[in-house]
A protein has these predicted regions:
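DPxDG-like acidic metal-binding loop motif
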Residues: 1-8, 12-16
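Long, positively charged amphipathic alpha-helical accessory segments at protein N-termini or as interdomain linkers
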Residues: 14-32, 42-174
Length: 174
């Protein structure tokens, strides 16, 4: 297999996100969404977080899913668990299977199709958000995730593209 370029590697959190979302939907029906860049939401609350790190010439994808754990009271308004006993081995296998399917499509040059699918589950779409990057704060309306993985944000009638940043959703839109 060919080595991923840095540009391609920036798409791994999105690929892992849609793969995990797809696997979870096959295990438990419900309202799933993808929050750019690395979270899966279930009924408006965070169910899963994804972390991708480089290890020498490889990339390690970490996926944390709240399966049956009790959510502490202080974060119940923003986090959720699947609240059921699931066969963890089956869940892991389904996530790996879905990642393999999506990675194959990605390798075959079908990223445009995948990004459209991701946007179908875009949790931020049309929400008023605040993006923190260092000591700078940007506010606007989230739009689509574009081909290169950046998020479009409409600010003062103009579309700006963001590749990083901590996202806060204005409460009125959440």
């Amino acid at each position: 297999e060919k080595e991923l370029s840095i540009v391609e590697a920036t798409k791994l959190p999105l690929l892992a996100g849609i793969s995990t979302l797809s696997a979870l939907k096959k295990i438990k029906d419900g309202a799933y969404f993808f929050k750019w860049t690395n979270d899966v939401f279930f009924y408006g609350k965070k169910l899963c977080g994804i972390l991708v790190e480089r290890a020498k010439n490889d990339f390690v994808v970490g996926i944390g899913i709240n399966v049956a754990n009790k959510i502490p009271d202080d974060i119940k308004n923003i986090a959720i668990s699947m609240e059921s006993d699931y066969d963890i081995d089956k869940l892991i296998l389904k996530v790996v299977e879905e990642f393999s399917v999506y990675y194959k499509r990605f390798s075959e040059g079908k990223w445009s199709e995948i990004i459209k699918e991701i946007n179908n589950y875009n949790f931020l779409k049309d929400k008023k958000i605040r993006v923190n990057i260092g000591d700078k704060i940007f506010e606007g309306i989230a739009k689509n995730i574009v081909e290169d993985g950046r998020l479009e944000i409409e600010m003062n009638g103009e579309i700006k593209l963001f590749s990083v940043g901590e996202i806060k959703i204005e409460k009125d839109y959440y």
